[in-house]
Amino acid sequence: PDSAVRDLIVALITLKYTQSNSVCYAVDGQAIGVGAGQQSRIHCTRLAGSKADTWFLRQNDKVLNLPFLPTLGRPDRDNVIDGYINQNEEDVCADGNWQKYFISQPEPFTKKEQEEYLSKIDGVALGSDAFFPFSDNIERAYKSGVKYIAEPGGSIRDDAVIDCCDRYGMVMAFTKMRLFHH
């Protein structure tokens, strides 16, 4: 679909201006997770996937309806939300802490609830500035709702990566152009 093409273009443009060894998750015309400068492609894919997951979790009703104190500023809200959804809710929801941020003590956003919510995410685009050397990158990307991938290709294991994409019903395009800065 046109939206996938747009999102892949956004991801690839983002990667062109990012430190080498990078991947970018994109959806709705915006980059939602970038993993850059790591020592391996899978580390980039995990890092960017984690950021994309956080972006999606911020859209959950449980997060959108947090009962913040009206005096709490935007930067503090952002930090509290990050702690709340990234398994550090004791820092913001524990007795003695929640009163600094909320009108009432929020219910925890459990790992099970988060996994269930994220399992419904679909249609995410993923760009890579170089080939995926192993299918583990595809496995990790699938967990974050990736459906469309653009990468240069050229790995001796391209067949295994393509097979993994096929197994998950993903569309992958080879750009035949690396976006490395070196």
Spans of features found by a protein language model:
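Short beta-strand scaffold segments in enzyme catalytic cores
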Residues: 21-29
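Feature captures the catalytic cores and cofactor-binding loops of soluble hydro-lyases/lyases
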Residues: 39-182
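Short, conserved, surface-exposed binding loops centered on an aromatic residue
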Residues: 14-17, 25, 115-118
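Short, basic/aromatic recognition patches
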Residues: 1-21
